[in-house]
Amino acid sequence: MLQPKRTKFRKQQKGRNYGLASRGNAVSFGEYGLKAVTRGPITARQIEAGRRAINRHVKRGGKVWIRVFPDKPITAKPLEVRQGKGKGNVDHWAFPVQPGRVLYEIEGVSEELAREAFRRAAAKLPVRTTFVQRTVL
């Protein structure tokens, strides 16, 4: 699963996820993309589940890019532990998705195959998504 090799600090504050994606909002590498429409955190497990769903559907054809990386540590205290005594340990890693962010890209497959692969990946994700094509300028 995806997670940083090393970080400057082990834990982060929760923060807030405002605004629209100003970076990573265009299809850059492949022909087709899966773009987020709503906001929310996506965990490393969800990113991996979506990647597996895409790869299983396209089989050996096409190339897939993952355009998000979970670099935000999410902490949790153990079950049945009283509050206080400091912040909990890192439980998992997540990526805060903003509307307009491209999550996955694919090339080398037909549009119908890409649509179906992204539909299956979208079922694994906690945000609503839409299918986008690369725009040639």
Curated annotation (Swiss-Prot):
One of its GO terms (cellular component) is cytosolic large ribosomal subunit. Pfam families: Ribosomal_L16 (PF00252). Keywords: Ribonucleoprotein, Ribosomal protein, RNA-binding, rRNA-binding, tRNA-binding. GO terms for biological process: translation. One of its GO terms (molecular function) is tRNA binding. Belongs to the universal ribosomal protein uL16 family. Part of the 50S ribosomal subunit. HAMAP family: Ribosomal_uL16. Binds 23S rRNA and is also seen to make contacts with the A and possibly P site tRNAs. This is Large ribosomal subunit protein uL16. It comes from Alkalilimnicola ehrlichii (strain ATCC BAA-1101 / DSM 17681 / MLHE-1).
